[in-house]
């Protein structure tokens, strides 16, 4: 998993509340267990028309936002079913950070496990960031996980809270496997000692 320390990138505004995981990636794209190639399904029902052509009005199809790395979204983002494909699709598109006033718990935790930083902010701060994100190609934010701050294009900053353990994992690029490998030495020592004490096992 890639480390997340400081990210400067274009922020796309998505001022829609209750975006569920089926809206993030429809069920038609859940037939794979691969984490790559899912970007084509991200917000598919909003990004594409029925004939498969792009919907020019959807934010991620607009020229200034095609390479967005940050998503500023409405309240209760990621509600609905617990599909882990939702953060996979966001990450495959290039989204490394989602900012909202609240998230569904399972989606929130899945983001951390997949290298995405979900940030909860107050409504007034979200309104400010949504305005900042509406500037098209100039909608650049800097998210500093070490300092726990978001810096806007005008130089202002917003502080945010994040669980210390989850922050540690993102800063060091540790997923569940990485966390286990951190303890590899202790595990090897335990296994060797157990073999001495219980050679028959």
From Swiss-Prot:
Enzyme Commission code(s) on record: 4.2.1.33
Pathway, per record: Amino-acid biosynthesis; L-leucine biosynthesis; L-leucine from 3-methyl-2-oxobutanoate: step 2/4
Recorded GO CC terms: 3-isopropylmalate dehydratase complex
InterPro entries on file: 3-IsopropMal_deHydase_ssu, Aconitase/3IPM_dehydase_swvl, AconitaseA/IPMdHydase_ssu_swvl, IPMI_Swivel, LeuD
Keyword Lyase applies: yes
Gene Ontology MF term list: 3-isopropylmalate dehydratase activity
Keywords, comma-separated and alphabetical: Amino-acid biosynthesis, Branched-chain amino acid biosynthesis, Leucine biosynthesis, Lyase
CDD domains per the UniProt record, alphabetical: IPMI_Swivel
Catalytic activity entry: (2R,3S)-3-isopropylmalate = (2S)-2-isopropylmalate
Example GO BP: L-leucine biosynthetic process
Biological function: Catalyzes the isomerization between 2-isopropylmalate and 3-isopropylmalate, via the formation of 2-isopropylmaleate.
Quaternary state and interactors: Heterodimer of LeuC and LeuD.
HAMAP family (UniProt xref): LeuD_type1
NCBIfam families: leuD (TIGR00171), PRK01641.1 (NF002458)
Family: Belongs to the LeuD family. LeuD type 1 subfamily.
Designated name of the protein: 3-isopropylmalate dehydratase small subunit
Source organism of the structure: Brucella anthropi (strain ATCC 49188 / DSM 6882 / CCUG 24695 / JCM 21032 / LMG 3331 / NBRC 15819 / NCTC 12168 / Alc 37) (Ochrobactrum anthropi)
Chain's gene name: leuD
């Amino acid at each position: 998993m890639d480390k997340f320390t400081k990210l400067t990138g274009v922020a796309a505004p998505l001022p829609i509340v209750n975006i569920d995981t089926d809206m993030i990636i429809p069920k038609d794209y859940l037939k794979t267990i691969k984490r790559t190639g899912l970007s084509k399904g991200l917000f598919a029902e909003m990004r594409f028309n029925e004939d498969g052509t792009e919907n020019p009005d959807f934010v991620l199809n607009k020229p200034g936002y095609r390479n967005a790395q940050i998503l500023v979204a409405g309240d209760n983002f990621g509600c609905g079913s617990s599909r882990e494909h939702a953060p996979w699709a966001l990450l495959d598109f290039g989204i490394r950070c989602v900012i909202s006033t609240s998230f569904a718990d399972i989606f929130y935790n899945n983001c951390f496990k997949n290298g995405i930083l979900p940030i909860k902010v107050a409504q007034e701060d979200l309104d400010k960031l949504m305005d900042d994100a509406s500037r098209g190609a100039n909608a650049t934010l800097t998210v500093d996980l070490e300092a726990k701050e978001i810096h806007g294009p005008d130089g202002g900053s917003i502080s945010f809270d994040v669980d210390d353990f989850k922050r540690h994992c993102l800063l060091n690029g540790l997923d569940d496997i990485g966390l286990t490998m951190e303890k590899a030495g202790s595990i090897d020592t335990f296994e060797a000692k157990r073999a001495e004490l219980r050679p028959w096992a």
